[in-house]
């Protein structure tokens, strides 16, 4: 077994352990999913806490975004959130992963302080407030991006768009950039997603889904569960978790319904990412995720790599766990891509003495 293969297996084992899973457990040994029982806390206390969480969550949406539904010709509706830039500049077009929603980027939005960067989020089909569907194929998700981005561009004439995708969202945007090349696409950013590691980690998904509670007694308990198993930042969780549940605190997204498409989601991801012509940024929670194609691409200087491997308070949702760190990386990357000479001079204090231009 190669060292690279061993690294992949270690990565998968770490992910299973972090999620409370065991790769040695047979399917017959997996317990039935349970409804999380109520605790000794009084219902009035839980209700008060939930009311506070929901109030802040709704206020955050109303204060920060222009909210719209985009409806395609098939009647599929997509919930969108747009925070315009205060100064002329670029748009960060964000795509979340499977089982998540646009609000996974909520706290990150709070930390992006560059007034020349606008932010656009949307709930992909069957997630958040977008309409449910039975088709979760990669090609369909790419078509959804094409529709949503066309609608957005027709409403808000933009000439500079950076694509940011987390997990599955990264695979969708990487393929979109390959199928729909455009001069307005200035950059491609992937958050904690690598093809080979992603494909292998899918082996743990059935166990993870089977062990999740089917519902929660309160929203605060749902947040606590996420903090115990998936997230490290409660401020982020209070914005992202409410978007995952119905009024009855059951999961909005049926991840089991997506299973037929899992094996195709990440096919060709590394090739699509490296094939993008503009500046590329890959942010990972650990170095062990890099596959052979990305290792070669990194050595050839084809993309920028940022790894948060030394921080124990971050995991797969690195943008939720470390929103300030990720925001700084994003804004620096965008500045450097748009105007490298200005970035070098004003942000780094470096002025090239040879009189030439700095390559992007």
UniProtKB/Swiss-Prot annotation:
Pfam families: Abhydrolase_1. One of its GO terms (cellular component) is mitochondrial small ribosomal subunit. Transmembrane segments: none annotated. InterPro entries: AB_hydrolase_1 (IPR000073), AB_hydrolase_fold (IPR029058), PPase_methylesterase_euk (IPR016812). Residues 26-50 are annotated as: Disordered. Its EC number is 3.1.1.89. Belongs to the AB hydrolase superfamily. Demethylates proteins that have been reversibly carboxymethylated. Demethylates the phosphatase PP2A catalytic subunit. Involved in the regulation of filamentous growth. This is Protein phosphatase methylesterase 1. It comes from Candida albicans (strain SC5314 / ATCC MYA-2876) (Yeast).
